[in-house]
Design a protein with these regions (language model features):
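N-terminal beta1-alpha1 ligand-phosphate binding loop
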Residues: 2-28
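Hydrophobic anchor at the start of a short beta-strand
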Residues: 3, 32-33, 83, 117
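Conserved beta-strand termini and adjacent loop/short-helix elements that scaffold enzyme active sites
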Residues: 6, 35-37, 122-124
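Short, surface-exposed acidic/glycine-rich loop or hinge patches that mediate macromolecular interfaces
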Residues: 8-12, 39-40, 57-61
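FMN-binding flavodoxin-like domain, especially the glycine-rich phosphate-binding loop
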Residues: 16, 49-52, 56, 60-177
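Secondary-structure boundary elements
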Residues: 24-29, 173-177
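A short beta-strand-loop structural module common to alpha/beta enzyme folds
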Residues: 28-41
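Short amphipathic alpha-helix with an adjacent loop that forms part of the alpha/beta core around
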Residues: 41-47
Length: 177
């Protein structure tokens, strides 16, 4: 099966997730193409693939602008394929944040007029060493809002790799024999 993975990333966690999914699918014997949506080439056609996975992350209550542009621009091609949307956010790291994470997905899909076959809410990562003071304050006081953040320095990854792999397997092979 030919699978296309298209992603947008801000701090690199969505790229890491997309690479993980690509490796998982290749190991299962699938042919995989991995592309950043900003690097999309006009001679590359979604129609060549059996399934399409799009991944993006939430920052300041919305997904990346390039993903917001990409999806509507390719909506007719996406509509004819089984598609999976992986939305990465810190809200998905906490049970009480899942509803908010879903709200950002719903807003994105409504604006894009896209109805993927499936949606995965994946927890992101904290990268304190890459944040300036302003971004660190947003993370602490808006995103985390008193939640435990596993420390205040370095990188803290919240992605549940097994759950992600299980969701991707179910999408690619919905009827395992």
């Amino acid at each position: 099966m030919k699978v296309l993975i298209i992603y947008a990333t801000t701090e690199g966690q969505t790229r890491k997730i997309s690479e993980h999914v690509a490796d998982q699918l290749r190991e299962a014997g699938h042919e995989v193409a991995l592309r950043h949506c900003a690097d999309w080439q006009s001679d590359f056609h979604i129609g060549e693939f059996d399934r399409v996975i799009l991944a993006g992350s939430v920052h300041q209550k919305r997904h990346q602008r390039e993903l917001e542009i990409f999806v509507p621009a390719h909506l007719s091609e996406l509509a004819g394929k089984p598609t999976l949307f992986i939305s990465v956010s810190l809200f998905a790291a906490y049970p009480d944040g899942m509803a908010e994470a879903q709200t950002y997905v719903d807003e994105f899909l409504e604006t894009a007029k896209w109805r993927p076959s499936g949606v995965v809410l994946a927890a992101g990562a904290l990268r304190y060493d890459e944040y300036d003071y302003f971004m660190e304050q947003i993370v602490r006081h808006v995103v985390l809002e008193g939640r435990e953040d596993a420390g205040s320095r370095g990188e803290h990854e919240f992605t549940d790799w097994k759950a992600l792999s299980d969701e991707v397997n179910a999408f690619v092979d919905p009827d395992p024999a």
